[in-house]
């Protein structure tokens, strides 16, 4: 991730847009709105060649904005697109294998652990971060209560940074921040109305600046 602030920061999940140029423009515009730690780029339903094309357009503009570009699932695409990292939704074994192959050259994290036991197993392989929720799990205005609870428990005990998936309401970012986790991931909350994405990011950062708890040194 890029340099940490002393509060929870925003992670974006790139929107599901089939046209690579349109997707790149929307993400680039959004990143003008303010601080974003990283952008995760899912494959959605794209074939490997199309995903490669999308990634090659997105990665440089994400990096130019000062954020880390993380490719979901495909290490070959991550390497060819010169991404900063790889986001995986698998179990500890999947993450361990990827860490052995790609760290520290690439950031490697993810998990989607649904319970504490699975989360601790993932923690034992020392990913760069753990993710609670699904990349397309923003189906309600608020973050899923289970993910909030897991994030709060994790952040209180374990030093590995944590990302929790937020909801479709931009204000859900604050509820995530109040658990003490380092990062909140948003997708539809930012990109539901693409033209508003920059102003939504500015509003979320202002909200977190004003109300999010501060981390102790």
What are these regions (language model features)?
Residues 183:
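C-terminal binding/interaction regions
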């Amino acid at each position: 991730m890029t340099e940490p602030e002393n509060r929870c920061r925003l992670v974006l999940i790139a929107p599901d847009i089939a046209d690579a140029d349109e997707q790149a423009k929307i993400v680039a515009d959004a990143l003008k709105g303010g601080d974003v730690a990283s952008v995760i780029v899912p494959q959605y339903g794209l074939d490997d060649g199309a995903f490669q094309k999308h990634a090659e357009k997105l990665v440089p503009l994400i990096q130019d904005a000062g954020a880390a570009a993380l490719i979901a699932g495909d290490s070959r695409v991550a390497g060819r697109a010169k991404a900063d990292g790889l986001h995986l939704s698998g179990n500890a074994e999947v993450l361990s294998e990827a860490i052995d192959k790609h760290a520290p050259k690439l950031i490697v994290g993810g998990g989607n652990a649904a319970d504490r036991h699975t989360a601790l197993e993932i923690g034992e392989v020392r990913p760069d971060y753990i993710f609670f929720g699904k990349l397309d799990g923003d189906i309600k205005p608020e973050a899923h209560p289970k993910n909030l609870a897991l994030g709060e428990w994790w952040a209180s005990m374990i030093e590995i940074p944590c990302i929790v998936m937020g909801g479709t309401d931009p204000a859900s970012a604050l509820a995530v921040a109040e658990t003490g986790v380092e990062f909140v991931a948003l997708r539809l909350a930012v990109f539901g109305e693409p033209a508003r994405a920059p102003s939504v990011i500015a509003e979320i950062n202002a909200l977190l600046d004003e109300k999010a708890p501060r981390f102790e040194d």
